[in-house]
Amino acid sequence: PAIYLAEKYNLLTIVISPLIGLMNDQVKNLELKRYPYAKTINSDISPILKQDIIEKVSDGKYHILYISPETLLSRSDVEQLIGDRTIGMIVVDEAHIVTTWGKQFRPDYWYLGDHIRKLRKKQLEKKKRSFITATFTATAIYHGIEDMYNETVNSLHMINPITYLGYVKRKDIDIVIDKKQKNKAVRRE
């Protein structure tokens, strides 16, 4: 969807990601797939390169921007990051962190929904265009006592979200257990 929104409407997708390694890996994988229009702004990036990325995002040369919630929320005005670009989508990657880390460890995750709501309102007033919020995770608990799904939906102020629940067991992953007995060779089961 991010590439479609960029190519068809020149809209920007902001991906909120918890770890620098994930951001760098996703940008690198897009580059390997010959999509050079995704960048990240994080503490691994030099100030000069950050400024260059910000200018190119603003100029419409980059269409997907990976940042942390702290980077987004530390800017009182998102235009410091994206200039006059119109947001087409905000993606919250590893969305279970909104509730698991957001309450104590990384509170900017917990306040992300309020900030996204303000961004949406401002963009609607200024450009008469809203944006999609999409969340992705493989580890959220759905319903029950520790219901991360509904807590995340509520924290991010998502109204009537479209939900896809996939199968958690993957056929392409095998688990091998090697038992080692004292002073004996390893045998496989």
Which positions does each model-derived feature cover?
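Conserved SF1/SF2 helicase motif Ia
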Residues: P1-Y37, N42, K122-K128
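Conserved catalytic network of the ASCE P-loop NTPase/AAA+ motor domain
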Residues: L5-Y9, E31-K33, E55-G60, Q80-R85, ...
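Conserved helicase motor
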Residues: I20, T40-K50, P69-R75, L165-V168
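Conserved helix-turn-beta segment of the N-terminal RecA-like "Helicase ATP-binding" lobe
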Residues: L22-I48, D52, K56-D59, N150-L156
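Short glycine-rich substrate-engagement loop in P-loop NTPases that contacts/grips substrate
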Residues: I45-I48, I64-L73, K179-R187
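SF2 helicase catalytic motif II
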Residues: Y62-H63, E70-L73, D77-K128
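Conserved RecA-like ASCE P-loop NTPase motor core of nucleic-acid helicases/translocases
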Residues: L12-P18, Y66, T133-F136
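Interdomain hinge/linker at the junction between the two RecA-like core domains of SF2 helicases
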Residues: K122, R129-I132, F136-E189
